[in-house]
Amino acid sequence: MLFRSLLDRFGLSVEVRTPQDLEVRVQVVKRRDAFDRDPEGFKAQWSEANTKLRQRILKAQKSISTLEVPDDLLHACAKVCHALGTDGLRAELTLMRATRAFAALSGTKKINLTHLRTIAPMALRHRLRRNPLDDTGSHERVQRCLQEVLG
């Protein structure tokens, strides 16, 4: 486990879990096997989907600077971070930037609370202090805080 001061320098954190759905598990194994047997063929098969994703990301990069973060959303970021007891302002800055990026990737013209709610667990879960009296996971703690603070 890294020190909190180092974890705070990571912008986002994701939890990677093994899929529980059997069909999804089988599909993952099939795709991995297809790649192992024919990497070039696999890349060719997914080329169109990768190109579409790349274009979507490039479009988002171009539009991100035009998206203004409204004051009410900045206040929401600050309220959530304050309620979670995050140190410093890096959490608010990361939450604001990642929310803006997600909104741009979504192709919307306005940033809203839905974008914030989606991004908050990734931006905040690794910044939480451990609470020995609360055995819920950090993702759930962030979700609970969002509900309590933002409704």
Map each language-model feature to its residues.
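Short, small-residue-biased leader/transition segments that mark boundaries at the very start
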Residues: 1-2
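A short helix-turn-beta junction within AAA+ P-loop NTPase domains corresponding to the substrate/partner-engaging
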Residues: 5-20
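Short alpha-helical basic/polar micro-motif
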Residues: 8, 93-97
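Conserved AAA+ ATPase "sensor/coupling" helix adjacent to the nucleotide-binding pocket
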Residues: 9, 27-66, 80-83
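Conserved RecA-like P-loop NTPase ATPase core
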Residues: 10, 77, 99
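Conserved nucleotide-binding/hydrolysis micro-motifs of P-loop NTPases
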Residues: 17-26, 32-34, 123
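Acidic catalytic patch
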Residues: 66-77
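C-terminal engagement/docking regions of AAA+ P-loop ATPases
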Residues: 78-90, 101-151
